[in-house]
Structures are given as C-alpha cells and as structure tokens.
C-alpha cells in the first residue's frame, strides 16, 4: 500500500508527569469505544510508556501528552533516520466547537492523533538548485530513504515521533469494526477519520507542467545527491509535483468533506495522505526558517482558493 502549518490550537509546552483507555469521570470497561474520544479520556500504556490525558473545558479539548505512541514502532535510529524516540512534554488546546473560516490555510502540523502523536505530512528535506528553485521532498518517494516505519512515521531531531500517513498501529490498536475510524482531531477542532475501504478519494494528480532547475543538490550528514531537474516530468518526489483538481475525487483541497452534515478530514492511502491545509478557524503558529517558495505554501494555497 503506497503511503506515504500554524497550529489550530493554542500550543504550549508543559511538564507532564501502560493500553487502558477510559472516560475520566466514568471509567469504561470497553477501551475501544469511539464515543470515548469525544469526551474526556486517558491513555496510559505501561508497555510503550504512553501518557495522554484529555479533558474538556467550555472552549477547548485540552490534551496533555508525552507523545509516545501506544503501539509497536520501527527501529530508531535507522539508516534513513538517525533520531531516537523520546518523550515530549506537550499541551494542546483544540477548539471544542470548530467553525469554518471560509478559506483554506496551509498548515505544517494539521492535527494530533488520539494517542497524542502529531500528524505532519510534509518534510524538512529539500533540493536547492543553483538557478534558485527549491523543491521540498515528499515523505513517500523512492529517491531518499527517510527511515519511515510500518506506521508511516519516523522521528524528528527533537525525539518527536510523528505520522506522515495512515497511523497503522493506532488503527490496529482501536480494533475498529466500522469502515470509518476516528483517528484524531485537527488543530481547528474538526475530527480526522480514516476509511478502511478507501471510499473517500482525494482530488490531487501529478502536474503536467515540467520542472525547472539546474544543478540541484540535496545534502545531509548521511546523503548527498545531485540532480538536473530542468524539463523533467513530475513523478511525486516533490510536493510541487502535485496539483489539486476540484471534483476529481470525493475530498476537497484540505482532504476534507461533509460527513452526515458536519465537516471532517480524512487520512488517505493516496496523496496528499492527510490534510496540508485547514478549513476551520485556528491560531496560526509562526513558522521558523526561510519563507516557503517554489510553488509551495503561499502559491499552493492561492490555487486552493
């Protein structure tokens, strides 16, 4: 199966202090009931070290978590990823009553899974060309080994384990009986689902526009590559290889749709794998580093509009 930002929340860091999941006030004997995740709940897994606690206020769904997954992962560090999974100290405040904003806004981290592991579809890897182009590399491609595991996830230098695609281990731990599986919440408060049958299709396809760029290079401590991209055809290696075609599939430019009259997002087996933009109101995060370029963030969102 091929799989493979501006938080929608107020994001703060706090210190928080192994799979039992339950309602905080009225403990459940069934740890996998989806309805639990709409209320206050906790996940503590002694085997994997997961500690995630969710409470509801009048305004927010507040999650404090160490962001350790409650399922098996790949071996880290590995050849493509030199980082070790470590506990984080995070608090998310996600809008409890989400509202659509009327526009689509690009977002680096579109949401967080039920277990406290964040979703982050794009990577920090890029090819830089002497002619000025910058191509951001997709997580799911065959040019570079980024060390993704069986859960379509790997680890950042901070030790943060994060999903780039379908969170396979999380879904298996939920043991879902229905096709539509609730896997998390977007930063604007709308839920994130996965369809086991793949009935909701994305609306992206490869661009027909040839690339530009001479003497393009990628460098990190472990890999160095040189490419001449001028007049090459998009093949999915780079974010800018893909374009949104309205009506091509079932989902919109943010990989969302209306489900039973309410807006939701989907993680999917096909590109873009998860939301790269959000439709709801959320507090934007100041993104560090150089500004987006070469048809990435700003231009892509203009296309969405």
Predicted regions and their residues:
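Extracellular/lumenal glycan-associated surfaces
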Residues: 113-118, 157-170, 259-272
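Bacterial Sec-dependent signal peptides at the C-terminal "C-region" and cleavage site
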Residues: 13-25
